[in-house]
A protein has these predicted regions:
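Hydrophobic positions in the central parallel beta-sheet of the AAA+
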Residues: 12, 264-266
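P-loop NTPase switch/coupling surface
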Residues: 1-170, 180, 188
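Extended helical coiled-coil dimerization/tether regions that scaffold
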Residues: 1-3, 155, 159-243, 247-264
Length: 267
């Protein structure tokens, strides 16, 4: 960012998106919980929120910090996507309004990228300000271009994380991580054990080693440490799901050691 100001999403407004009309809610400083019955679009909302920010940088596990909506959800050419109106407002750490992005949809099916989201700077909530001026302010104050993401490292954990390890063993690849790897150098193994054992006490022994798990059905690789009395491919969905969430937190933990780190977003 231009002056290294820390930004965070503070408000999400959905004027129109599929079955959502005139829906808006605040986003918490540290955590936001979206609840509801199955099939209403909760995962869609989370992925939309993740589409306004990102960083074109690889994590230690190989995934990037810039999730694309079309990688997880399909927008059909027959949809009225040009009429969708969604706005994400970002504030500085002290709550000072910073900028708003309209999540617009662009048809890139001819280039094989599908219909994807472009976060465009908007002047919707700024009195007496032209769109051009809003774009200039966002660029000068926060180094955010008119059609660019807000520079917050972002991870979206899709529901593919719930795919059971043992259901399709032939699509799962498990590789032990060497002791010289950055994960061990930065004590990520200790963090993994600590966080996992806080949720499910006495699950991972001190001598357990880190492995990298790649599922054919999941875009993100994850970390794994053997659980007491439970072979890797025999983990429950809940145990594996917890491991996936902690893996994402480890990605952020590793990123936090960079001098320029200024927060991250996990959806």
């Amino acid at each position: 960012m231009g002056v290294n100001k820390k930004l965070r999403p503070e408000h999400f407004s959905v004027e129109y998106f599929r079955n959502f009309k005139e829906v808006s809610f605040e986003l918490g400083r540290k955590i936001t919980v979206i609840s509801g019955q199955n099939g209403v679009g909760k995962s869609n909302l989370l992925s939309l929120i993740a589409s306004g920010s990102g960083l074109n940088k690889k994590s230690v596990l190989g995934s990037n910090f810039q999730p694309e909506f079309y990688e997880f959800f399909n927008v059909d050419e027959d949809e009225d996507f040009e009429s969708y109106k969604l706005y994400l407002t970002y504030v500085e750490d002290d709550g000072t309004p910073a900028l708003t992005k309209r999540l617009s949809f662009k048809d890139d099916t001819k280039t094989g990228r599908g219909i994807r989201i472009i976060p465009r700077t908007s002047n919707i909530y700024i009195d007496n300000c032209t769109l051009k001026q809003a774009e200039i302010n966002a660029k000068n104050e926060y180094d955010v271009g008119g059609a660019a993401r807000v520079k917050i490292p972002t991870i979206y954990l899709s529901l593919s994380r719930l795919y059971p390890l043992g259901e399709r063993k032939d699509t799962v690849k498990i590789t032990e991580i060497r002791k010289k790897n950055a994960f061990y150098q930065r004590k990520a193994d200790e963090k993994y054990k600590e966080w996992y054992n806080v949720v499910i006490p006495n699950s991972i022994k001190s001598e357990a080693v880190l492995s990298k798990v790649e599922k054919g059905a999941c875009a993100r690789a994850s970390l794994h440490m053997d659980i007491n009395n439970t072979p890797t491919l025999s983990q429950s969905i809940g145990q594996d799901n917890l491991g996936n969430i902690i893996s994402a937190l480890i990605d952020i933990y590793m990123l936090s050691m960079d001098d320029e780190y200024n927060g991250a977003l996990l959806c």
